[in-house]
């Protein structure tokens, strides 16, 4: 039986926009025979019970996350598809330690580089998602992914890379100071700072912290690599090599307006950068979004086109978005996903059928409402429109009265 590897789709001439997906692709390319697997750019987390990609489908069974997939391949092949089989005891310890180190530190840097940094997100990352996603995911997924990246990196104190958040914070501070009477009237309406000014201040404030973060990841990896061909051996790669390729390819390859991560990799650790480029060419190749959707497979990777988007899938997406945005419901769903990472649909409880039906109904209703809501507004009776207009005028008058009262109090 052929294994199906489902991933987030191609971006930046790489086969995936996600580092874990890239690492898994590199692992498959290095150890699994080409005729034993296919690569599917489903770009849809709902294919996996844990709501995660990458995910491997073996018949009715799904396995997600890089490390789980590596372990599954070892068991599936009776040890034949194991990149770490040749490692000594000490090398296995280094493999575990540096793999954890690469995943944790690499994820934070990719979050900052492609998602938190405003120029890179809007100029490169968001359009890349638009090229691989269908409606409504192309509007939901990029924002959701960026918000998650902001939460993961919030403790680093580098929110100034997000120019929107920086400007919003400045505006809130200005309004608070105005309300408290701390700013003279002559300074209340000074011109807003331009993007260029903000970029200058952001770069200056964040430079030293970013240099520290990049050095913490790149320098130990280059020291471990040394003059060897691979991270832990001079003869063959390991699962650590796959992870390093996955994360550092997204640091080296994307063309972005603010390439601070690529510059750090090239200038601080040039040997590591050459290694990443060599391994990328060997195991990932150069890919376009069209390759993933082509009906005629070709190239370095065994692509298979994903299934077409159906009304049921759209409904399921809208249903999941609504469910994950509901506090109590979202927590219940998370616990259910964590309960069985290697989920088998054939053993699923029967109530999942009801949830699927509810997803289709709810999603279809939401889609219909989305398309027809403007028309419903236009068809309101004239009396209703007049009442709405009068209510809005009343609210504006109340706001004006409140402003006048504040002015009077300031004079007193």
Question: Predicted regions span which residues?
Answer:
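Short amphipathic alpha-helical interaction elements and helix-loop-helix interfaces
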Residues: 34, 75, 79, 224-227, ...
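Juxtamembrane amphipathic/hinge helix adjacent to a transmembrane helix
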Residues: 266, 273-346
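GST-like domain detector, emphasizing the conserved glutathione-binding G-site
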Residues: 2-155, 162, 311, 315-412
């Amino acid at each position: 039986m052929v294994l199906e590897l489902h991933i987030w789709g191609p971006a930046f001439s790489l086969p995936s926009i996600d580092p874990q997906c890239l690492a898994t692709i590199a692992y498959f390319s290095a150890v699994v025979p080409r005729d034993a697997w296919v690569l599917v750019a489903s770009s849809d987390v709902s294919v996996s019970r844990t709501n995660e990609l990458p995910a491997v489908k073996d018949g009715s069974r799904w396995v997600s996350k890089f490390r789980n997939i590596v372990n599954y391949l070892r068991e599936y092949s009776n040890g034949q598809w194991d990149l770490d089989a040749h490692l000594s005891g000490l090398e296995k310890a280094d493999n575990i330690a540096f793999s954890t180190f690469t995943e944790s530190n690499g994820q934070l840097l990719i979050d900052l580089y492609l998602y938190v940094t405003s120029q890179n997100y809007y100029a490169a990352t968001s359009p890349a998602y638009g090229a691989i996603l269908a409606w409504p995911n192309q509007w939901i997924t990029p924002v959701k992914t960026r918000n998650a990246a902001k939460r993961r990196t919030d403790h680093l104190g580098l929110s100034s890379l997000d120019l929107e958040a920086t400007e919003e914070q400045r505006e809130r501070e200005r309004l608070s100071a105005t309300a408290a009477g701390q700013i003279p009237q002559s300074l209340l309406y000074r011109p807003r700072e331009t993007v260029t000014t903000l970029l200058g201040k952001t770069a200056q404030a964040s430079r030293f912290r970013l240099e520290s973060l990049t050095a913490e990841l790149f320098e130990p990896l280059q020291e471990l690599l040394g003059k060897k061909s691979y991270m832990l051996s001079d003869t063959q790669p390991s699962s650590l090599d796959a992870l390093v390729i996955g994360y550092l390819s997204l640091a080296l390859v994307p063309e972005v307006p603010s390439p601070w991560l690529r510059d750090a990799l090239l200038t601080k650790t040039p040997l590591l950068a050459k290694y990443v480029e060599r391994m990328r060419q060997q195991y990932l190749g150069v890919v376009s979004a069209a390759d993933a959707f082509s009906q005629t497979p070709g190239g370095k990777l065994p692509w298979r086109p994903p299934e077409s988007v159906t009304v049921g899938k759209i409904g399921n997406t809208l249903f999941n978005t609504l469910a994950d945005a509901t506090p109590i419901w979202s927590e219940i769903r998370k616990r259910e996903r964590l309960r069985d990472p290697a989920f088998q649909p054939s053993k699923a409880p029967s109530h999942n059928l009801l949830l699927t039906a509810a997803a289709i109904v709810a999603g279809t209703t939401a889609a219909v409402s989305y398309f027809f809501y403007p028309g419903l507004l236009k068809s309101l009776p004239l009396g209703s429109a007049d009442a709405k207009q009068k209510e809005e005028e009343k609210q504006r008058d109340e706001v004006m009265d409140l402003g006048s009262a504040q002015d009077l109090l300031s004079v007193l």
